[in-house]
């Protein structure tokens, strides 16, 4: 049996204690940091939230591990737009094709990202296209992580991992909007969704900056 020299005891003990910090924080204490106010407090005035009841709350917890969410609708140019704002500490449940769960009875044909210019910079808007369907369908969303919109949530999580390892997890927030309309109305739908997303982001950003 090899004896450990006393001069190594202190640094080795320090390393072991350091390694225990994230284990305790994430396995036992489960430290979670909310870096902004509830996002649905900053919706555009034209958007009306509604209470979906306990069944929807259970559904949100099951599919997104979320206890902070809001859904509602608004009308623009004769079209109805439905939105979902969901915050979760299990980020992958939000960024991995959320339209699969939120858009009913439709199959995505392709996905893309539009880089939308706003007053505060570029906003990466993710889109799900459903082809030449009747009715026409389009879903758009953006994701906020560490108070910033992210184009690649995978990369954002990797970059944040060293910090969250010792400070605790931070939530990701999904701002999602969808609409259906007559064939040929995709242009109007896209415009309406873009306007809502920009407005929602600017209000959310302003409220979060006020907290700091």
Regions found by a protein language model. Name each.
Residues 27-47:
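Alpha-helical transmembrane signal-anchor/signal-peptide segments
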